[in-house]
């Protein structure tokens, strides 16, 4: 009997990125189910699964090697480690070959860079189900991949992925325009109520319970929702993580420059405020690399905060005041493209918020 067999061997454990948002290791789609297994897990225990169709592979950040068995024949997949990492399959039912006869069985082997057009081309032309998942789009696939196509469209139009990020940011702002307008109008009302809120704080300064009740009564009377300012931020959190995912996993973003000192949008801003952005001949350690773009992002966030009403709670107000500085430090190691997106998102938000609140001020005077 003849049994179809295929195997991918990795001789030693590679250097992997080690980031939770990216899978590097064994990867397969078996009967429509995505299977991802880490190297260290397979060293401890082998993986076995029987399927009717799919593919078997080993995936790096930017590369994939895979074997696709012939469709219509059941096969067993095994990931194991015996001094080498092995991903293999073998058909479960043999084909009898008689004397002076032959059979033909076609399997496909793909070793490719994870460029989206290449991977999607293989998936479509070879009819490989879910082969596009070899690029780790994440659980927000339905946002991440369309967002990449939007970026790629503007890249082809404008010739620079940094400009494409800005263009997509404008489109996102336009998409959320009605929600943002509602939020800014509510915050504008909150700002106009500041004198009355100050009066209530003075009146009930010794009784926090009565102050809270008076505040809630004021909000109800003026039809103001103090939490409405959070809505635009909450809605855009998935977009933020989708941008992060795209910049981290797609080969198209690797070594793509922006204007000025940004030579790779997928890497952090290489400048540092601690050596005056290169004017002092000193290379600070990585934790001190707070570059120009993170600082620009922090400044835009600080200015944007000034357009918002001051929180009634003094402790909350202090936390909000230091929040831009906190985010500047947190986002400094992130991809420059992500920080550029957040900076321009802040700028467009400020413009919209200023226009809405200016109109409200004119109406009340």
Report the location of each language-model feature.
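Short, membrane-interfacial amphipathic segments enriched in basic
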Residues: 132-145, 202-209
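Conserved catalytic motifs of ABC-family nucleotide-binding domains
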Residues: 245-298
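Hydrophobic core segments of alpha-helical transmembrane domains in multi-pass membrane proteins
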Residues: 294, 337-346
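Transmembrane helix interruption/hinge and helix-loop junction motifs
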Residues: 158-161, 329-339
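Hydrophobic alpha-helical segments of integral membrane proteins
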Residues: 136-158, 193, 215, 261-262, ...
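Soluble non-transmembrane domains of integral membrane proteins
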Residues: 1-129
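Membrane-interface amphipathic helices and adjacent TM-edge segments
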Residues: 100, 174-240, 249, 300-332, ...
């Amino acid at each position: 009997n003849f049994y179809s067999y295929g195997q991918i061997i990795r001789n030693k454990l590679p250097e992997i990125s080690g980031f939770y948002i990216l899978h590097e290791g064994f990867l397969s789609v078996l009967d429509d189910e995505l299977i991802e297994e880490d190297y260290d897990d397979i060293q401890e225990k082998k993986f076995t699964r029987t399927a009717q169709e799919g593919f078997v592979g080993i995936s790096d950040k930017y590369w994939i090697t895979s074997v696709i068995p012939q469709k219509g024949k059941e096969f067993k997949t095994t990931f194991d480690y015996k001094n080498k990492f092995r991903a293999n399959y073998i058909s479960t039912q043999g084909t009898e070959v008689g004397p002076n006869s032959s059979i033909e069985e076609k399997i496909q082997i793909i070793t490719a860079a994870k460029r989206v057009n290449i991977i999607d081309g293989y998936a479509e032309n070879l009819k490989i189900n879910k082969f596009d998942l070899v690029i780790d789009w994440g659980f927000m696939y339905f946002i991440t991949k369309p967002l990449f196509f939007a970026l790629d469209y503007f890249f082809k139009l404008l010739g620079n992925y940094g400009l494409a990020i800005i263009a997509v940011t404008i489109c996102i702002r336009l998409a959320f325009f009605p929600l943002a307008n509602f939020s800014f109008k509510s915050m504008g009302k909150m700002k106009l109520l500041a004198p009355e809120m100050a009066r209530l704080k003075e009146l009930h300064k010794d009784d926090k319970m009565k102050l809270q009740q008076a505040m809630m009564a004021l909000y109800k009377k003026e039809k103001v929702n103090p939490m409405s300012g959070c809505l635009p931020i909450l809605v855009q959190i998935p977009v933020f993580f989708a941008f992060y995912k795209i910049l981290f996993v797609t080969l198209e973003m690797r070594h793509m420059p922006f204007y000025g000192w940004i030579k790779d949008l997928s890497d952090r801003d290489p400048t540092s405020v601690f050596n005056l952005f290169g004017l002092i001949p000193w290379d600070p350690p990585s934790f001190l690399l707070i570059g120009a773009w993170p600082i620009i992002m922090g400044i835009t966030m600080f200015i944007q905060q000034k357009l918002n009403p001051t929180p009634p709670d003094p402790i909350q107000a202090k936390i909000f005041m230091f929040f831009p500085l906190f985010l500047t430090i947190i986002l400094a190691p992130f991809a420059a493209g992500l920080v550029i997106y957040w900076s321009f998102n802040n700028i467009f938000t400020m413009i919209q918020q200023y226009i809405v609140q200016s109109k409200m001020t004119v109406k009340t005077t």
